[in-house]
Amino acid sequence: MAKKPKNSPEKSKYSSDTSSSLYSQTWLASVVIIGLLVGYINYQHVYTLFENDKHFSHLADFEREMAYRTEMGLYYSYYKTIINAPSFLEGVQEITHDTVTEHGHEINTLNRFNLYPEVILAFLYRPFRAFAKSANWQIELCWQVNRGELRPVESCEGIGNPHYFYITGVFIVAGTVASSIFYLGVLVSDSIFGGFLSVLCFAFNHGEATRVQWTPPLRESFAFPFIIGHIAILTFVIKYKKSGHSMILLLTSMAVPALLFWQFTQFAFFTQICSIFLAFSLDLIPFSTAKTVIHSHIISFLIGFLLLFGNEMMITALYFPSILALGMIIYISPLLSNLKFRPAYVLFLAIIFASITLGLKIGLSKGLGIEDDAHIFDILRSKFTSFANFHTRLYTCSAEFDFIQYSTIEKLCGTLLIPLALISLVTFVFNFVKNTNLLWRNSEEIGENGEILYNVVQLCCSTVMAFLIMRLKLFMTPHLCIVAALFANSKLLGGDRISKTIRVSALVGVIAILFYRGIPNIRQQLNVKGEYSNPDQEMLFDWIQHNTKQDAVFAGTMPVMANVKLTTLRPIVNHPHYEHVGIRERTLKVYSMFSKKPIAEVHKIMKEMGVNYFVFQLMNCSNDERRPECVYRGMWDEEDPKNSGRTALCDLWILAANSKDNSRIAPFKIVYNANRNYIVLKI
């Protein structure tokens, strides 16, 4: 038998295939490892920033509780409830039948406040402590801290401390944001360099991309990592036209936690549905892939709805109707294969999508009588018209709910993020228009770059959200980083017409400029040094714990009430979680203490709510000549014009505090006035 030549075609082909497969596996492993590494670096970075800002390691546990301001304290209080309960199940039972948060009402806080992060962390904390104890691990180290004029306190550090376990969980989840941005950069650029470019942009604009390092317990801290992770998986699915049960499972594994952890997730997913709709209507997503995506959203919604005990806001928000609208469009699209004129096709689908989404949204809200999300549309309405009420003022007078600040745009331009993203965006749009038949469609052909178009449209949606409400720049800035990675996409930037040397040189030059402009931002973040201390509030809480009954009911401004509940465990009537029509009505009644209503009328309101004590801060009655509508006096003149000519109750409280004469405010009585900051009125 004749021997085959050494360099036979079969052997060369086998060798080539093996080499290609090995290269592919090595490349994939490199991408995964680098992604995990940047995630770990991000975790360490946010942890360091948090410690630098608060000097958290040297605080006593009660000081750590006070450091969780406003709604952060409210969320942490439920974690504290579960870990201090006799058993995990009893703790969950306590928070699902809560009578402390809104005195006079029993509420299911899991349904109302998206508390699954606290439930999960509390569930993990108990067995972790037990296992560490059995293994003789030292997981907590305690010492006494001298606080100068204040009494010494015991401070405990280590993963065994409930606070450390909690914030470590937050920062581990938050660290994955950098990983997802790196993977997205690789996906849209077809290059590891694109991944590096996107994650460098994120690092150098970190202060404009997230606030987890300052406010760990907020819902966005837990949910956004899953939202951006979901976007990464969705981009992969669209890019490689994947479909089937495994992809549904992957997408659902990210979408469900995101929905459970943050009420705003459904609005973020609504923008995603809109972005997918546009890509699908331009024939950039195949039918099978579109079905996979919409099925994952339907399953995620149903699981989220059930685990949140039938959260009413999920039914009436735009997300649920948009899922049904896109699902219908996907399934009727084969019937429209003969409609070849693309503008007519897209317009027809857009009319169907908008009609079903808005029709169902309005119909469900009216039919079920649910107004929980009405304040969102009131806020948007107030931004473009003269409309305003007490509730919209509480939002829009806060900087984070105002329009995006010019300084933010200036910073993002200064680090070259916006210029780089704009160059990438314009280049993509130019190539897309050039290579896509926008007039006539061939339903049998699926276009390329659907994953890029999806992310570009998602960026546009995120930018609109950020410009309207500054707090939402956490969606815009990361997506600017993702789109900036297109600069490393060789197919978009010149292709074979530009030599590899020139492309690499341009990329290296851009990265060098990014380092030059971005490193000072990182240094500035790391140079933030602080130490949390609030002796006035500490004195107040000591007084409450030693001078009031355990079942004494408190009212006051929303931020303070969250900390009163967390630290003193006293029942409260109002709190900072404002996304429910009932609590908005309660808060309006409580804040009548800052109005110009007759004092007897306000006393009656407090009595009817069962309030025993009202916590008042002198700064609550301050004036602002620049924005008089943004102080409580101005808000109440707008809300209650018939009493605008009367003496403000604020003036009476201040006068009584200064003169120590309770007769001026009878039947109220000042029972605490120790530090000219906090005043407690007995009802």
From Swiss-Prot:
The chain crosses the membrane at residues 21-41, 167-187, 188-208, 220-240, 267-287, 298-318, 319-339, 344-364, 413-433, 467-487, 502-522. GO terms for molecular function: mannosyltransferase activity. SUPFAM superfamilies: Glycoside hydrolase/deacetylase. The keyword Acyltransferase does not apply. InterPro entries: Dpy-19/Dpy-19-like, Dpy19, Glyco_hydro/deAcase_b/a-brl. It is found in: Endoplasmic reticulum membrane. Disruption phenotype: Defects in the cell polarization of neuroblasts Q cells. Expressed faintly in neuroblasts QL and QR, more strongly in the neighboring epidermal cells (dorsal hyp7 cells, ventral P cells and lateral V cells), and in dorsal and ventral body muscle cells. Keywords: Developmental protein, Differentiation, Endoplasmic reticulum, Glycosyltransferase, Membrane, Neurogenesis, Transferase, Transmembrane, Transmembrane helix. Its main location: endoplasmic reticulum. GO terms for cellular component: cytoplasm; endoplasmic reticulum membrane; perinuclear region of cytoplasm. Changing residue 185 to D: In dpy-19(e1295); randomize the neuroblast QL and QR asymmetrical pattern of mab-5 expression. Abolishes C-mannosyltransferase activity in vitro. GO terms for biological process: carbohydrate metabolic process; cell differentiation; nervous system development; protein C-linked glycosylation via 2'-alpha-mannosyl-L-tryptophan. Its EC number is 2.4.1.-. Belongs to the dpy-19 family. This is C-mannosyltransferase dpy-19. It comes from Caenorhabditis elegans. The gene is dpy-19.
